[in-house]
């Protein structure tokens, strides 16, 4: 008789399972005999140990495995018969009351996948972002490259300006007490690069060699040095050297220094434009995809299996700990990481994954081989040997699967943009690139 699956609440289900003791013992004896053919028992030749002795040494482990296997098979038959898709693993609880001596009974509690309804795409409001790349962006990038290759020349009597390198001594106190990291001598940095806190750079601006200044500085609340975060220090700086940054001319020598073998400045600019356009395209795609996915998640109203959310949380915690280890953080495995910190985002990820999967199935948006190859070739342009990168990705199943997942998401985004209410929005170049 087919077991009856009960609905508890939401996606949670329950079913009672039973296996006969006789079936368990029959399988246990069969496995003991198989083990006995090769088992090495002291005092006996291989295969000659008494079954009773094998029962004592191997019986408990074999019996445990057999019961798990038979109960698992009964569970699969029950959910298959009810045509259910199980999310995660069931929780099994032994039953004793009202159970015959010749039967082992269990209650399996589990979750099922929800019925996912793709929202009406025509009702979704999404944003498609765009950033034009002009000569101004190319020239701006050229300026950045020139500043990175600046040569600094000491200028006597020069008041420091943005772009100058200053060498100074500094000492800071909090409530009159020195603190760790608050003092240095012959400390160099370039004004305007954002390496130092804004108040510190502002204090050093306009000073000449030999001049000093005393000023207050409030550390941000989220400052990396937790012992001083949110506190106000008093700093004294003394400038010892001011060096002006002399930028290289944009000429053949400069072009060659950036890998343009011919020293052709116009070809260098064309290469820079190509690289900028590639980076801009990737960032715009990311922003637009974010808008599309946010709209899908917001419109997708259905329960998600807690088992899948918990699994995602565990994966993200493991990844976070691994990242801490890579950064050299001591005792990374014992750093507190409460599950609730990750649960909201994990629920969103699970919901989005179910929605995308259903949308791909309904609209037949699977990644095509030619799309995957085109995306790999595009990605390979970031490397010096693109052809080798393409061959590597095509030959490696795992790497290829990663690109297939990206292409699949691209197809989903394109499909939503074709059907949703789309608002086009220009993003300033500096903002897109995180320079503003």
From Swiss-Prot:
Entry-linked SUPFAM superfamilies: FKBP-like (SSF54534), Triger factor/SurA peptide-binding domain-like (SSF109998), Trigger factor ribosome-binding domain (SSF102735)
GO molecular function, one term: protein folding chaperone
InterPro entries attached to this UniProt entry: PPIase_dom_sf, PPIase_FKBP_dom, Trig_fac, Trigger_fac_C, Trigger_fac_C_sf, Trigger_fac_ribosome-bd_bac, Trigger_fac_ribosome-bd_sf, Trigger_fact/SurA_dom_sf
EC number(s) recorded for this UniProt protein: 5.2.1.8
Top EC class for this record: isomerase
BP terms from Gene Ontology: 'de novo' cotranslational protein folding; cell division; chaperone-mediated protein folding; protein transport; protein unfolding
Reaction(s) this enzyme catalyzes, per UniProt: [protein]-peptidylproline (omega=180) = [protein]-peptidylproline (omega=0)
This protein's UniProt keywords: Cell cycle, Cell division, Chaperone, Cytoplasm, Isomerase, Rotamase
One GO CC annotation: cytoplasm
Pfam family, one: Trigger_C
Subcellular location: Cytoplasm
Domain PPIase FKBP-type: 163-248
Domain comment as written in the entry: Consists of 3 domains; the N-terminus binds the ribosome, the middle domain has PPIase activity, while the C-terminus has intrinsic chaperone activity on its own.
Family: Belongs to the FKBP-type PPIase family. Tig subfamily.
UniProt function note: Involved in protein export. Acts as a chaperone by maintaining the newly synthesized protein in an open conformation. Functions as a peptidyl-prolyl cis-trans isomerase.
Designated name of the protein: Trigger factor
Gene: tig
């Amino acid at each position: 008789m087919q077991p009856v699956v009960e609905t508890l609440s939401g996606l949670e289900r329950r079913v009672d399972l039973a296996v006969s003791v006789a079936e368990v013992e029959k399988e246990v004896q069969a496995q003991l005999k198989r083990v006995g053919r090769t088992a090495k028992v002291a005092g006996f030749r291989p295969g000659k140990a008494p079954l009773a002795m094998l029962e004592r040494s191997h019986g408990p482990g074999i019996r445990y495995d057999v019961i798990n296997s038979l109960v698992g098979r009964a569970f699969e038959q029950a959910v298959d018969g009810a045509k259910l898709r199980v999310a995660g693993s069931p929780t099994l609880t032994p039953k004793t009351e009202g159970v015959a001596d010749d039967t082992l009974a269990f209650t399996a509690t589990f979750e099922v996948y929800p019925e996912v309804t793709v929202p009406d795409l025509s009702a979704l409001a999404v944003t498609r972002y765009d950033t034009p790349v002009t000569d101004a962006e190319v020239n701006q990038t050229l300026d950045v490259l020139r500043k990175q290759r600046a040569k600094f020349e000491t200028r006597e009597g020069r008041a420091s300006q943005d772009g100058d390198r200053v060498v100074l001594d500094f000492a800071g106190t909090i409530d009159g007490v020195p603190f760790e990291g608050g003092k240095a001598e012959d400390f160099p940095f370039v004004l305007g690069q954002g390496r130092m806190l804004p108040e510190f750079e502002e204090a050093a601006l306009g000073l000449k060699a030999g001049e000093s200044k005393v000023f207050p500085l409030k550390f941000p609340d989220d400052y990396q040095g937790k012992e001083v975060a949110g506190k106000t220090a008093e700093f004294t700086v003394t400038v010892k050297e001011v060096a002006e940054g002399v930028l290289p001319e944009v000429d053949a020598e400069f072009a060659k220094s950036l890998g343009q073998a011919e020293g052709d400045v116009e070809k260098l600019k064309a290469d820079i434009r190509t690289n900028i356009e590639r980076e801009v395209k990737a960032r715009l795609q990311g922003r637009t995809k974010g808008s599309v996915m946010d709209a899908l998640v917001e419109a997708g109203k259905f329960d998600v299996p807690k088992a899948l959310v918990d699994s995602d949380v565990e994966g993200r915690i493991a990844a976070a700990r691994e990242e801490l280890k890579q950064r050299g953080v001591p005792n990374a495995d014992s750093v507190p990481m409460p599950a609730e910190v990750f649960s909201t985002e994990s629920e969103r990820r699970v919901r989005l994954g179910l929605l995308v999967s259903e949308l791909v199935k309904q609209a037949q948006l699977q990644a095509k081989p030619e799309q995957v190859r085109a995306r790999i070739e595009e990605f390979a342009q970031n490397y010096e040997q693109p052809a080798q990168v393409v061959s590597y990705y095509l030959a490696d199943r795992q790497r290829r699967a990663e690109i297939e997942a990206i292409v699949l998401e691209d197809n989903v985004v394109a499909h939503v943009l074709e059907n949703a209410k789309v608002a086009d929005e220009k993003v300033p170049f500096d903002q897109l690139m995180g320079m503003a």
